[in-house]
A protein has these predicted regions:
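Short acidic N-proximal helix/loop "leader" segments that mark the beginning
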Residues: 1-35, 251-279
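Short amphipathic alpha-helix that is part of the acyltransferase structural core
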Residues: 26-78, 86-88, 95
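Secondary-structure boundary elements
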Residues: 48, 62, 91-93, 158-167
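Short acidic (Asp/Glu) patches
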Residues: 68-76, 80-84, 109-121
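Residues that flank catalytic or metal-binding motifs in active/ligand-binding sites
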Residues: 83-85, 97, 202
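Short, His- and charge-rich active-site/binding loops that engage polyanionic ligands
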Residues: 88-122
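Acyl-donor binding region in acyl/amide transferases
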Residues: 110-212
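Charge-rich, low-complexity intrinsically disordered segments
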Residues: 200-269
């Protein structure tokens, strides 16, 4: 269910900003980024992360996916750490939409809570995993929501490439699975089940063989959009680091202690060796 320290991708490296890297996106065909694409940013501060996860809480509570809590915030424990990157986009002065990307790490992935055997099977075959989760959108317009999702998935794909990962996994409601399959080439890797993290709502586990799919001549629309509009490694270099001192006294710390009995300061301290991102050559 968990990956060992020896399977980390960092090998004791420092953060992106302190390393000379070979940018994998230099190999990809380039085209101009569409001016109509909803803007996205990588969260660089505690305030931005908590604002994003407050939106997740608001939307998930409204949909009946989670119980209310006094911190008015929602986070999966596996998403808190230096292996994570919180992506968000603005809607006026507020966070309008968000998703969280988290690499496989010693705590495992959120989907391990229901698909540990299947994920362990992928790990044994050499897959290096990135989970996409905690998606939320403030807007009610379906067309605008799809545009934001395309934009955020572009960030997810390039985060996976820059961190030398092979697969992206995601758990979605059955009615959303076809979108990811048709627009990105995701495939089911295990049967649907109920998901305790969202009040036992149904979940379909999907897997994108990232590098295999990108090597094909013809790509699904979403994957082609990400390929043709690359992001540099520097886009992630100042992401919020989830250092113990940054989390101390935060809403994140309070929520994780109250809900899961986890002290993120202590957990983050034990994971300091995983600070860096291993970039592909």
């Amino acid at each position: 269910m968990k990956v060992s320290d020896s399977s980390k991708t960092s090998s004791g490296q420092e953060g992106l900003q302190s390393k000379t890297v070979v940018d994998i996106t230099a190999r990809l065909p380039r085209s101009g980024v569409r001016s109509s694409e909803p803007p996205c940013l990588c969260a660089t501060s505690l305030e931005q992360v908590e604002s994003a996860w407050r939106l997740v809480y608001q939307r998930y509570s409204q949909m009946g996916l989670i119980d209310e809590n006094r911190f008015a915030i929602h986070a999966a424990p596996a998403a808190v750490g230096q292996h994570a990157s919180v992506i968000w986009g603005p809607e006026g002065p507020e966070v309008g939409y968000t998703m969280t990307l988290f690499r496989d790490n010693p705590m495992g992935l959120a989907l391990d809570s229901v698909y540990a055997r299947s994920l362990d099977g992928l790990r044994r075959k050499g897959s290096r995993l990135l989970e996409v989760g905690m998606l939320a959108d403030r807007r009610q317009s379906a067309s605008r929501g799809v545009g934001a999702l395309f934009s955020m998935m572009r960030w997810a794909i390039h985060y996976g490439l820059h961190t030398d990962l092979t697969d992206i996994v995601i758990g979605v409601h059955p009615r959303h699975a076809q979108f990811y399959e048709r627009c990105y080439g995701f495939q089911k890797f295990a049967p649907p089940t109920s998901y305790p993290l969202v009040r036992n709502h149904p979940v379909v586990p999907l897997r994108l063989r990232l590098r295999e799919e990108l090597a094909k001549d013809e790509l699904p629309r979403g994957l082609a959009d990400a390929r043709d509009n690359p992001l540099p490694a520097s886009a992630f270099s100042h992401r919020f680091a989830f250092e113990p001192e940054q989390l101390r006294g935060s809403l994140i710390e309070g929520f994780l202690k109250d809900r899961y009995g986890i002290d993120p300061g202590r957990e983050a301290a034990s994971g300091r060796a995983d600070r860096g991102l291993a970039l592909s050559a």
